[in-house]
């Protein structure tokens, strides 16, 4: 007789069949690796540790990044490579190629999507369309950018609010966003409109969700605080990949001199009761962001990773490095371009600029203010009127002889470090502390002595370090007729400075640690050369912006001499009459 299975065996088989059917019907968890960069700022070549010109240390560079990207693509199964904006602006590469270098090398590396940053608009819409948008094949995104009817050239069709990427059969939605303050920070023109990021991203996410997309990345360029708000407020976003604020996040001991502001990823509790990871990867291509997510039923159930430091332990890809060097050849003749003329000696010597007001410092700071004059309104003649620049960042004079010709390479000798001119918001107390710091080692030819524009400062060097500031007056910005007013410790001021001291260089840690806001700008070379081109002939003077007094009750020496001369003249005049 055939064997009849027992009831218990029959039940076990049925249960096993049911479990198998359930297992086959249930999708397995999906792992996604997100590699990301932000605020690369034209760092095509390798840099030093502080993202300036590479002399001894070796970090970053597109050829080094490519090596690590290829390694991770070979190791991990599902990989996306994303950029959160500001490929433009930051080195002589952008000054010369105007964005063509960004298009070429970001295309060569094979990015999957990019958000528009504010600096992508530094040369207007035409400077974004060509050479960049017309020469890349991946989607360029911004959900909160709208074009007015009168916009010429039209950008319609060259960027999108969002895209859907296919990663081994899984649909991943990516929504872009750009700082709504771009009209103040860059030059997009009057017909490009930057709307509220949160509302625009939510609208686009809702569209993707209605299409059945359940894995959505917000990719944008509005700064860490806005990134966190998007994670909190926007329903349906699973991860936020940001930029603009150059935020360094890291879990564990940091691998370099950069101090993390929080763990990587930074976790935000959303209003719809989820935990959303937020990431940035510092700036300048120094790190490659690495975030590994595990999705189950459209929800992130695991997140791990850390930015990868791209230092000399990672070999530069030889093929891409050869391409970099080929493009670099064209930069050599760029230094011979004549940009203007000086009829006075531009004193950029160490002795002068590290110990007293120097006219080279005045020229540089005046150029920095001029570069930021845009969009005045009924209250502000300019959004910033104060500049500080450390004397140690000025490395050479320019002679007025030989017809006073100023070439690009002349300026490169003055400003060799490739810094950017950045916008900060600080309290008056922070600015006062910076000036006290600037003279704490006065007389030792150290680099922290500050050159200025829009400031009149008095020091008493007989006081102990840390209390040598006697008086600071600042040029008002919220006024119709600019005039000097006493610095108020509890008032918030906008200032322009270079990226080196903005990041705490030369001991200016208060500018890094106490700033309320930070926006990266154009290169120092491009700012000063544009100013000289506009002026054609320059003749900066020493104007009494920085004075030394004997004590707080003593008039500045220069003003005392003027007063005595005026008194002698009046005495003579009255006597003769």
UniProtKB/Swiss-Prot annotation:
It is a lipid-anchor; GPI-anchor. Disulfide bonds join 353-358, 365-387, 476-479. Zn(2+) 1 binds at residues 39, 41, 86. It is found in: Cell membrane. It comes from the Eukaryota. Its cofactor is Zn(2+). Its main location: membrane. Glycans are attached at residues 135, 311, 347, 403. InterPro entries: 5'-Nucleotdase_C, 5'-Nucleotdase_C_sf, 5'-Nucleotdase_CS, 5_nucleotidase/apyrase, Calcineurin-like_PHP_ApaH, Metallo-depent_PP-like. Substrate binds at residues 246, 354, 390, 395, 417, 500-506. Residues 553-577 form a propeptide. It is an enzyme of class 3 (hydrolase). GO terms for biological process: AMP catabolic process. Hydrolyzes extracellular nucleotides into membrane permeable nucleosides. Homodimer. This is 5'-nucleotidase.
């Amino acid at each position: 007789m055939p064997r009849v299975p027992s009831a218990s065996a029959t039940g076990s088989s049925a249960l096993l069949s049911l479990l198998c059917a359930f297992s086959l019907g249930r999708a397995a968890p999906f792992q996604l690796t997100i590699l990301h960069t932000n605020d690369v700022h034209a760092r095509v070549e390798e840099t030093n540790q502080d993202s300036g010109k590479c002399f001894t240390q070796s970090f970053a560079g597109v050829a080094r990044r490519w090596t690590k990207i290829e390694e991770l693509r070979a190791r991990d199964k599902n990989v996306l490579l994303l950029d959160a904006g500001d490929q433009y602006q930051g080195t002589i590469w952008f000054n010369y190629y105007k964005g063509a270098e960004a298009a070429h090398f970001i295309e060569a590396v094979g990015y999957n999507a990019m958000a528009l940053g504010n600096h992508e608009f530094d040369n207007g819409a035409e400077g974004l369309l060509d050479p960049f948008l017309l020469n890349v094949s991946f989607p360029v995104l911004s959900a909160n950018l709208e074009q007015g009817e009168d916009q010429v050239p039209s950008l319609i069709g060259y960027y999108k609010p969002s895209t859907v990427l296919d990663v081994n059969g899984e649909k991943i939605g990516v929504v872009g966003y750009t700082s709504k303050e771009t009209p103040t920070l860059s030059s997009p023109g009057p017909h490009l409109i930057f709307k509220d990021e949160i509302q625009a991203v939510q609208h686009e996410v809702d569209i993707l969700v209605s299409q059945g997309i359940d894995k959505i990345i917000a990719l944008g360029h509005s700064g860490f605080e806005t990134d966190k708000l998007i994670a909190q407020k926007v329903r349906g976003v699973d991860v936020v990949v940001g930029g603009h604020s150059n935020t360094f996040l890291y879990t564990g001991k940091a691998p370099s001199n950069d101090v993390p502001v929080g763990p990587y990823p930074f976790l935000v509790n959303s209003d719809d009761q989820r935990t959303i990871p937020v990431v940035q990867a510092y700036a300048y291509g120094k790190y490659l962001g690495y975030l590994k997510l595990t999705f189950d039923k459209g929800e992130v159930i695991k997140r791990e990773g850390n930015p990868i430091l791209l230092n000399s332990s990672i070999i530069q890809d030889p093929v891409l490095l050869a391409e970099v060097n080929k493009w670099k050849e064209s930069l050599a003749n760029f230094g011979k371009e004549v940009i203007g003329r000086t009829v006075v000696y531009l004193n950029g010597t160490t002795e002068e600029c590290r110990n007293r007001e120097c006219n080279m410092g005045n020229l540089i700071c005046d150029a920095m203010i001029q570069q930021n004059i845009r969009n005045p309104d009924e209250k502000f003649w300019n959004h910033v009127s104060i500049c500080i620049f450390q004397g140690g960042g000025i490395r050479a004079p320019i002679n007025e002889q030989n017809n006073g010709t100023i070439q690009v390479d002349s300026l490169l000798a003055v400003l060799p470090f490739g810094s950017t001119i950045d916008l900060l918001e600080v309290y008056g107390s922070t600015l006062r502390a910076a000036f006290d710091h600037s003279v704490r080692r006065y007389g030792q030819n150290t680099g922290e002595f500050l050159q200025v524009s829009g400031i009149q400062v008095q020091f008493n060097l007989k006081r102990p370090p840390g209390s040598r500031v006697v008086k600071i007056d600042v040029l008002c910005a919220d006024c119709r007729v600019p005039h000097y007013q006493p610095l108020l410790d509890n008032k918030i001021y906008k200032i322009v400075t270079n990226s080196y001291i903005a990041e705490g260089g030369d001991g200016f840690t208060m500018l890094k640690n106490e700033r309320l806001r930070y926006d990266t700008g154009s290169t120092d070379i491009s700012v000063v050369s544009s100013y000289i081109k506009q002026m054609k002939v320059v003749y900066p003077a020493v104007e009494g912006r920085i004075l030394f007094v004997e004590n707080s009750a003593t008039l500045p020496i220069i003003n005392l001499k003027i007063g005595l001369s005026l008194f002698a003249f009046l005495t003579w005049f009255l006597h003769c009459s």
